[in-house]
Amino acid sequence: MKVVLKLRADGAGMAIFALPLTDTEHLFVKHLAVGYHYPVLSNIEFSIKGGQKVVITGFNGIGKSTLLITLIGEIPSMQGRFKFSDQVTIGYFEQDLEWQEPELTPIQIVANAYPDMVTKDVRKHLARCGISSKHAMQAIGTLSGGEQAKVKMCLLTLTPCNFLIMDEPTNHLDVQAKEALKTALSTFAGTVLLVSHEEAFYRDWAQRVINIEKK
């Protein structure tokens, strides 16, 4: 199943829309070890049902980001196994603000990613994610971390998915943007796996918290 997300940041607030999902198991993790040259985390076990909202916590450097990039297939696991349901389509938000071409504007970045989209719609989607007309025409590398994060969020909302994997999405956001994202995730009908160090951000809507330090 594929679900198209739309993010709105207007008078009604930011929202993510998705079709309802079954409550079958969407992710199964068993005896998983992750790392590069040696395991930084090992014997990780958990499962997530469709529609669940799960947060992973732990001290900085323990390997939370490494776990996520293993799950999305960027690096191989070192031991154990994991499996996503066949109906899962992943949308991934990484915390690093790195751009292959930092001289491009947000309009150009979105247009390059979605060449069939007309400029009017590109501007509309950026505006819905809180990007002003002025910032939409500036080089992405000159924008603040918060504005860059909003552009990444815009790209994510245009990606068909029903399972959001997010690595510290609030790192560069201001209070207003955090509140908007919190509302969006709490009302999202799909599955969420979030790495976060901000309990105030997730405690009102997360259904499970996995402290990776205790694994």
Model features per residue range: what roles?
Residues 2-26:
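ABC-family P-loop ATPase nucleotide-binding domain
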